[in-house]
Regions:
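Signature of N-terminal electron-transfer/Fe-S-associated modules in redox systems
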Residues: 1-158
């Protein structure tokens, strides 16, 4: 399932966990990263085999944590925080603006596969609210105008 480099990373990771099932969360992160930001049925089965646990157990863990995705995200995955600190300074309005601008709702990906939007409860950037994450990059004090510029910049980088 993994490339040669990914397999080496997997082996390094497993060497830190004498009990294989304890590596479940890091393995899910690795599998998701190596699979373009989401967990396929194949990757879930592979992780279950490595950890020597059932696929049902792995699926239960995936459903508990919001950071694991079962659908392929857009090339640019916009995670918009709507926790109280962000909402107090425009987080909900920013989410609505972004949905309107891209013509998609939170939890979905545009037909062209370029953007996906996810509403987040908290991304740990309360001091810089409203905040968003694009893929793995944080953007702080985002407003509708700066979101429009960000979307334009990303759109010009297909």
């Amino acid at each position: 399932m993994f490339s040669e480099e990914g397999q080496k990373e997997l082996e390094r990771m497993l060497s830190r966990y004498p009990i294989k099932r304890n590596a479940l969360l890091p393995l899910l992160h690795l599998a998701q990263k190596k699979n373009g930001g989401w967990l396929s049925e194949e990757s879930i089965k592979y992780v279950a085999e490595i950890c020597e646990i059932s696929e049902t157990h792995v699926e239960g863990v995936i459903s508990f944590y919001t950071m694991y995705k079962l659908r392929k995200p857009g090339k640019y995955h916009l995670q918009i925080c709507t926790c109280v600190p962000c909402c107090l300074v425009g987080g909900e309005e920013l989410l609505e603006h972004t949905e309107s601008k891209l013509g998609i709702h939170a939890g979905s990906t545009g037909d062209d596969g370029m953007f996906s939007i996810e509403e987040m409860e908290c991304i740990g950037a309360c001091s810089f609210a409203p905040a968003i994450i694009v893929n793995e990059d944080y953007h702080e004090k985002v407003n509708p105008e700066s979101m429009d510029q960000l979307i334009a910049d990303l759109s010009n980088n297909p």
